[in-house]
Amino acid sequence: MSTLGLLLILLGIIITCTFVILRSVNPIYSILNLIVIYGCYASILLTVEMEFLACIYILVNVGAIAVLFLFIVMMININIVEIQETMKKYNIYMFVGFIGLIGIMGILITNYQIRIKEEVIADFSMFLLNTEITTLQATPSYLDFYELFVETTDLRAMGSNVIYGSQSIWFIMACIILLIGMVGVIYITEDLIIEKRKLNARRRQDINSQVLREYKITIKNYREIK
């Protein structure tokens, strides 16, 4: 199997799992499909010889963010009926997004230029009747920036350009956003736990206080039975 075929299969799996996540109301199934997407992304990085980024992607996303998301969903205890009612409102937006995705894929596909040998173009009639395999070269019209940095490694490029270089501010902002998400989860779950404890305290039966009450003071609305 060629590299292009493998990439197309991985992209197809990613798109399929994305729509499954959007349509699923079970958070466990959503997490499993999300892990499959992360694995496909890591496989794509491995095909372009970025082993370190692929390992970091699996460790960070699958090992941390996916578990954090599952922790949030399980602690908040989202009602599935409410999710189903909410998802019905966004069907039109999902349809529009699907049409937009098809349009973007069409633009990317039509953005390729096909080069044919000059001797084939010179004799067009022979080209139509020729049964032999002719070499057709499809080259993208965009600039491949990976070839400009092919002499360096992904670890060196990430360390010199992303973490400790000109893009370090975005790396720091991503860390702050992740920290805010973790603190927000703790704050939300703490409020829920406190409210649950207060509710249980109000429902608790205190027999001593009930026995010591006077019925004339406690019972206000009554009628005399003759």
Swiss-Prot record:
Bilayer-crossing regions: 2-22, 28-48, 56-76, 90-110, 169-189
Subcellular location(s) per record: Mitochondrion membrane
Keywords noted in UniProt: Electron transport, Membrane, Mitochondrion, NAD, Respiratory chain, Translocase, Transmembrane, Transmembrane helix, Transport, Ubiquinone
Annotated InterPro entries: NADH_UbQ/plastoQ_OxRdtase_su6 (IPR001457), Nuo/plastoQ_OxRdtase_6_NuoJ (IPR042106)
Molecular functions per Gene Ontology: NADH dehydrogenase (ubiquinone) activity
Domain of life: Eukaryota
Gene Ontology, cellular component aspect: mitochondrial membrane
NAD found in the keyword field: yes
Annotated family: Belongs to the complex I subunit 6 family.
Its job: Core subunit of the mitochondrial membrane respiratory chain NADH dehydrogenase (Complex I) that is believed to belong to the minimal assembly required for catalysis. Complex I functions in the transfer of electrons from NADH to the respiratory chain. The immediate electron acceptor for the enzyme is believed to be ubiquinone.
Stated name of the protein: NADH-ubiquinone oxidoreductase chain 6
Source organism of this protein record: Dictyostelium citrinum (Slime mold)
GN (gene name): nad6
